[in-house]
Amino acid sequence: MHGLTGSGIVMADSQTKAGLRRVAVAIGLMMLIAGRPAAQAPGLGSSAELIDPKTFRVCADPRNLPFSDEAGEGFENKLAELFARKLGEPTNYTYLPQVVGFVRNTLNALRCDVIMGVAVGDDLVQTTNPYYHTTYALVFKPNTGLDGIESLEDPRLKGKHIGVVAGTPPATVLVQQGLMALARPYALTVDTRVEAPTQEMANDIAAGQIDAGVLWGPIAGYYARRVSPQLVVAPLLKEPERMDFRIAMGVRRSDQDWKRRLNRLIAESQPEIDGILAEYGVPLLDEQGHLTPPP
């Protein structure tokens, strides 16, 4: 099972088993936090619903753009606002860096009722239906001879200095292709209040310190627009290793009715969800894994 780290990046299987998180995948993208699998109040059975009936309570990272921040500028913030508005409720946030212990100290401690941006299949929370599907992408400066690349197996990458986040699926492929000797690793799990390794990678590409980088799709699309020159984002659609993941919301295992309610919200709101994601440059895939045009 793959998972999302604290910076929203989907990470490799061995890291998931180690109990690391995220990632709004995650995206990082199944949340990798050590914690109990479900939260229950004393004396309540496993069927008890523990949802605040009047407030859409979200747990998120305080400084993890493009996913979330305390100013509400991330796309997960915007999606939470959308869902809360449709429920006729205000939003309330509990912010905590998404590192080891995040689920235990937030959702399972009853400090919120939903975590945005969890990879489908996360075994630490119950996931809703997915509300978007995306993939890792290669990011590079324009006019560098890398246009049209869809796989890290492309021979044009031989001899290139490529940035990669340690412990993620692309790192495995770089090793398999003999590209790690010249690669530059960036940290996987960090305190986002003081470090921003994925933003650093985008800056390094723009400055010519590395030739290209592999980033989780939402991060690639966001930071590619925020450097000069703007970078090309090439989704990796033809990899031997899995690079694409479906992203959902995470809730407590006991909250079955709440999950069904959120599933209905997702189904009713999909065009609006896609519009918000497009504003942030998130590359979106259809059910067959094909890139979809922006709405």
Residue ranges and their predicted role:
Residues 24-34:
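Bacterial N-terminal signal peptides
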Residues 40-43, 169-190, 232, 264-295:
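Ligand-binding clefts/hinges and TM-proximal coupling segments of bilobed small-molecule sensing domains
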Residues 41-123, 192-195, 279-280:
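Extracytoplasmic small-molecule ligand-binding "clamshell" domains
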Residues 57, 62-66, 70-85, 138-197, ...:
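Bilobed "Venus flytrap"/periplasmic-binding protein-like clamshell domains
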Residues 58, 83, 106-108, 155, ...:
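Hydrophobic residues within well-ordered alpha-helices
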Residues 61-62, 133-145, 225-266, 282-295:
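Periplasmic-binding protein-like
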Residues 81, 85-86, 90-156, 167, ...:
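Acidic, polar ligand-binding/catalytic clefts
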Residues 89-90, 108-117, 160-161, 200-201, ...:
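Alpha-to-beta junction loops
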